Amino acid sequence: MGRYSREPDNPAKSCKARGSNLRVHFKNTYETAMAIRKMPLRRAVRYLKNVIEKKECIPFRRFNGGVGRCAQAKQFGTTQGRWPKKSAEFLLQLLRNAESNADNKTLDVDRLVIDHIQVNRAPCLRRRTYRAHGRINPYMSSPCHIEVCLSEREDAVARVAPTDDAPAKKKLSKKKLARQKEKMMRE
């Protein structure tokens, strides 16, 4: 069992999955992972399937040099987006693995949220390509390590309404407080 970069807050209500040295582009996978971070599990699976079918795009925010614009990226507040099919398939497989781990721990799968997802660079794999005049250039691949942690969503606690007998205090800015103090000092 490998070491995870972050342990969940409540290990009894969470599950983990990871993949090492995966032959999928690091940059595309990073952007795909950032798009599904903090999503509910069901929505993330549906979103990745839509990416594979090119119905929704992955917004490219960090590694966006030379990435073309697409209209589907507008819903994320950006202009650049792509449909990294292989990255989506690898992440979908990892989410299914984490979901089966959740079933094994008897967690409620419908309440799972992607609490933590991280993509790290793995050691590059070298190949070579032959060029003109007897030269040889490197032909590198950029694999990655992926880890994901799912947690059950906590129920939101309802806020207690203020009672009528105690009036709610009005919040004042620092400027107004200073003016009030000045008035008090003058009087």
Swiss-Prot record:
It comes from Bombyx mori (Silk moth). Pfam families: Ribosomal_L22 (PF00237). Keywords: Ribonucleoprotein, Ribosomal protein. GO terms for biological process: cytoplasmic translation. GO terms for cellular component: cytosolic large ribosomal subunit. This is Large ribosomal subunit protein uL22. InterPro entries: Ribosomal_uL22, Ribosomal_uL22_CS, Ribosomal_uL22_euk/arc, Ribosomal_uL22_sf. Residues 169-178 have a biased composition (Basic residues).
